[in-house]
């Protein structure tokens, strides 16, 4: 089958919807529903999120250390299958340990959309003389949030329980996985030409600062993405509106990577990232300052408009250092991101139980994200 630029991007977007939207983001949407219908506690919800992030880190570790591109291609296909299976399997048990195992496997699958698929598409773009940007691909993150939010919201209108929600998400993933399976470009086929760009690895100091900045990003992302629905649900007058807030995040995230690609063309990657991180920190801290509807809307739009931009810009920059095998350094970078995601939900869960709200968790998260800018200014000095 001939792979065109359009088909490659569609495959990438569909891959993200399946492996990230359903296997990862949907859990955030279903936390309040599972707390009410399945007896999931606040602390357990944090531990399940951590299990999901641990799985993601495992998937990233595999991607970073797997050098055979053909194996990566086949692994991506396996992740598509497992994303469907783990979602459907959530309905057959209410055992917290089995849920943790399923969330771990689903997290591993999420690495397929963010790392392996990104690397395969970036390599195909470079090898076929297209612009080496992943903004369109990462628009899939926003689209995945929109699609899953609309599905959950529509099923809430019909009083569907948490089991029906998970099964509907599994069916959705199975359908959308088809173009991701058929059109993802194979690394040694589909008309790819010989790589003309040589690897241009950065210095060790540059790598270290980049990883520290991305670690801080992962912490901020983990707290908001996991608990944003529950944060909104706790606001008086916004009950049962959490999935709508998540929908706003998705709507903001869909064009964000494309917009920030254009910003980066004018300012460079690092200056664009400094701006994105600053706005991300503001978006994270706003709900702790005020819980009015307007502030919540601004917060969700800022978070949606920046979190995926940070991922897209960092991974594109990392991939461009190693055009022969982009996913390798992408994976190394994302290990730092994933480590923070594993850590973040646990203190957030304890802070929630101690204070009775998310305010302290959000203050801590915003502070850690602002540390990113300090590391990025260090990167500016390294790049001069």
Residue ranges: model-predicted function:
Residues 321-357, 365:
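A late C-terminal transmembrane helix in Major Facilitator Superfamily
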Residues 102-140:
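Cytoplasmic helix-loop-helix junction between adjacent transmembrane helices
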Residues 39, 92-98, 268, 289-291, ...:
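Helix-breaking motifs and short loop linkers at transmembrane-helix boundaries and internal kinks
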Residues 59-71, 256-268, 352-353:
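Helix-to-loop junctions at the C-terminal end of transmembrane segments
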